[in-house]
Design a protein with these regions (language model features):
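Structural motif
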Residues: 1, 44-49, 85-92
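Short coil/turn segments that connect the beta-strands within blades of beta-propeller domains
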Residues: 33-34, 75
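Short, structured coil/loop segments at alpha-helix boundaries
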Residues: 5, 49-50, 167, 192
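Serine-hydrolase catalytic core recognition
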Residues: 68-199
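Residue position within the beta-strands of beta-propeller blades
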Residues: 36-39, 78-80
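Multi-bladed beta-propeller domains
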Residues: 1-30, 41, 50-68, 95-119
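Conserved residues at beta->alpha junctions
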Residues: 46, 61, 81
Length: 199
């Protein structure tokens, strides 16, 4: 075959949504029937995309959470993903209608036994006027008006993002009575090379 360069998308061709509760492995990129299937990070979540040989991009799955790997069949994509602040499960994406169905329930017992803090999304502007985003987890048993200690979590990288994905460490802190703040400052992924470049 002929090797050709596809148009640059100004985005990492991978899911860089951070979590401390996922294992590696599995497909991150594959080709089938004239399409290149891959993950990319958009702001604070993973997208599952495909691109044809002319460089036309199609976003197949675009919702909060993290996708760690996938497998493509004729009319479906099977993926391991974190949805709704749950640990990773197996999901099926129907390529005909775009519907997503959860297939496994490996972690239902864990979620039934543990009270999780749900992230609240917020935005703010830095000194340069650039809009940044972040999340806050409230302490377990939160009571308005009561004072609580807080922890600011920072991600490494460069080119990683925090999003609505389960973090064991953060949930442990919230369960111990802490507010947990985490943001995506300059240098984070998901917003193009200019935003990620901090040098």
């Amino acid at each position: 075959g002929v090797v050709r360069e596809l148009p640059y998308q100004d985005a990492s061709p991978s899911s860089t949504v951070g979590t401390d509760a996922a294992y590696g492995g599995g497909e991150k990129m594959t080709a089938r029937d004239g399409w290149l299937y891959f993950l990319k990070t958009c702001w604070n979540h993973a997208q599952l995309c495909r691109m044809d040989l002319r460089g036309n991009l199609e976003v197949l799955c675009d919702r909060p959470g993290q996708i760690s790997s996938f497998a493509v069949t004729q009319d479906r994509i099977y993926m391991t993903a974190m949805r709704d602040m749950h640990l990773a499960e197996l999901y099926c994406l129907d390529l005909k209608d775009g519907g997503e169905a959860q297939l496994s329930h490996l972690n239902d017992a864990y979620h039934a036994e543990h009270e999780l803090s749900r992230p609240e999304y917020f935005t703010f502007r830095n000194r340069a006027g650039i809009e940044l985003e972040g999340f806050v987890l409230k302490p377990a048993g939160y009571e308005p008006g009561k004072k609580y200690p807080g922890v600011l979590e920072m991600h490494g990288g460069p080119k990683v993002v925090f999003g609505e994905a389960f973090h064991h460490e953060m949930q442990c802190l919230a369960s111990q009575g802490y507010f947990v703040f985490y943001t995506n400052p300059r240098g984070s992924d998901g917003r193009g090379e200019d935003f990620a470049n901090v040098t």
